[in-house]
A protein has these predicted regions:
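Conserved Class I SAM-dependent methyltransferase catalytic core
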Residues: 112-184
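C-terminal target-recognition/interaction regions appended to catalytic cores
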Residues: 247-430
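Short alpha-helical segments and helix-capping/turn motifs at coil-helix boundaries
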Residues: 73, 164-168, 346-348
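Flexible, glycine-/basic-rich loop-and-beta segments that form/coincide
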Residues: 172-243
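Short, solvent-exposed loop/turn segments at secondary-structure junctions
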Residues: 93-95, 135-136, 170, 186-188, ...
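Core alpha/beta nucleotide-donor-binding catalytic domains of modification enzymes
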Residues: 21-125, 135-147
Length: 430
């Protein structure tokens, strides 16, 4: 009997210790810490994080902790990253992937960032990993790139699944669709969170009629007005302000929303320009990385050599002339690319006006979301609220850098719901 009591006590003690212990997380491409905050709110401990951009690191340190390391992940060896990790999280950049005869092209140096996440997972062997990415990753190379990505994770021993989650269906006031890849070493079903909200049928982002989830117990999606309407008539301020008995930070916005802008006089096909520049880059023997370094645009110049509709771009006139100097290309597209004229903005077509009575459109790093009744961009704080950052989460850096940090983040609430499901699975299977 005494032995039975002793064993029972030991089981209870082990259970209490397990409850007190926090699962350990390593975060890659952490940015301002949206996904990290969600995991922390769910009871995890983020023991190490990394980002290359100084402003994002400053925001992270001042709000979450000093465990973030600023630097290029390719230059950080695995032995400098903590061991005994339960979960690795991050949104690896998807630029740099291409398909040639069903094999990866090594021409573009940006795909190394994907390999770095794979490296950390291979070396640390976390029980779970979470990778977030844009929907466009599914169609790269006709879908072959994404299948290769999943297969790489499977080769490490993980059961891998991927789903498109719309944040608005999880209590985020924003119709943000992202691919969430989950992997686990237990071989169990990956634990995606259940929907908590539904998007009414009068919204462009309709309820999925083929979903097996009933809407009876779901709440209506949170509208933009419900989330940020109380700030509509609050004057922009660089200083903290008190609104509804709480302190609001970063209620600052770009007011450079003019009726006219300088745009290209002639239509230019971005795909043709991309092929043209890649041909001359090859002739000149310049890598994308070398061009990045020449311009000082870390991970920016590469946009000129991509056809992705979401991330490919045509150089500005001043950049075009500089490219011409270093690559030595002919005059074929000079006129089309560099001739600018003043154009009128058609707000309903050229800028996204915030719709008040439904979840916001996707908050992005660069695309301006224009306030429904103010001639300005949504403020940094309004965007942060739509990303479900806490009111006390303060962003640092220039105005554009703050917008970038908010737009690149994973919504905190969505991350928390994902983390809670992973925690439950860890509790059962560890």
């Amino acid at each position: 009997m005494n032995l039975l009591v002793f064993n029972l006590k030991m089981l209870i003690i082990e259970g209490v210790i397990r409850l007190m212990q926090k699962y350990r997380v390593v975060s890659l491409f952490s940015g301002a810490g949206g996904m990290d905050l969600g995991f922390i709110q769910a009871g995890f401990e983020v023991v190490w994080a990394n980002d290359v951009f100084s402003e994002a690191v400053m925001t992270y340190k001042n709000n979450i902790g000093n465990h973030i390391v600023q630097g290029d992940i390719t230059q950080i060896p695995s032995n400098e990253i903590p061991d005994e990790i339960d979960v690795v999280i991050g949104g690896f950049p998807c630029q740099g992937f291409s398909i040639a005869n069903s094999k990866r092209s090594t021409e573009d140096e940006r795909n190394f960032l994907y390999r770095e996440m794979l490296r950390v997972i291979a070396d640390k062997k976390p029980k779970f990993f979470v990778a977030e990415n844009v929907k466009g990753i599914l169609s790269l190379g006709g879908g072959k790139v994404f299948e290769m990505i999943k297969e790489d994770f499977r080769k490490l021993g993980y059961k891998v699944d991927a789903r498109i989650l719309n944040a608005a269906e999880y209590g985020v006031p924003q119709a943000r669709e992202r691919v969430i890849i989950l992997g686990n070493l237990f071989g169990v079903d990956n634990p995606y969170p259940k929907k908590t909200h539904y998007i009414p049928s009068n919204s462009p982002q309709k309820l999925d009629l083929f979903s097996d989830e009933s809407v009876e117990n779901l709440q209506p999606a949170i509208t933009t007005e419900e989330a940020i309407g109380y700030l509509s008539d609050v004057r922009l301020s660089h200083s903290p302000i008190k609104v509804n008995n709480k302190i609001i930070y970063n209620h600052i916005a770009s007011e450079n929303v003019a009726d006219k802008f300088w745009g290209r006089k002639y239509e230019v096909n971005q795909h043709d320009i991309c092929d043209y520049l890649k041909e001359w880059r090859a002739k000149a023997g310049w890598s994308t990385k070398r061009i990045d370094e020449h311009f000082g645009y870390k991970h920016t110049a590469g946009h000129w050599f991509r056809k992705d509709n979401n991330s490919g771009s045509i150089p500005k006139p001043e950049d075009w002339w500089e490219l011409k100097k270093i690559l030595g290309f002919d005059d074929k597209y000079d006129k089309e690319v560099t001739t600018l004229i003043e154009k009128e903005i058609k707000f309903e077509q050229s800028l996204r006006i915030t719709n008040w009575d439904r979840p916001s459109d996707t908050i992005t790093a660069t695309g301006p979301e224009i306030h429904v009744n103010k001639k300005r961009r949504l403020s940094v704080r309004e965007c942060a609220i739509l990303q479900t950052f806490p009111d006390e989460h303060v962003f640092y850096g220039s105005l554009n850098r703050m917008y970038t940090q908010v737009g690149n983040a994973v919504p905190v609430r969505l991350a928390k719901l994902i983390a809670e499901e992973i925690k439950s699975s860890l509790d059962i299977n560890s």
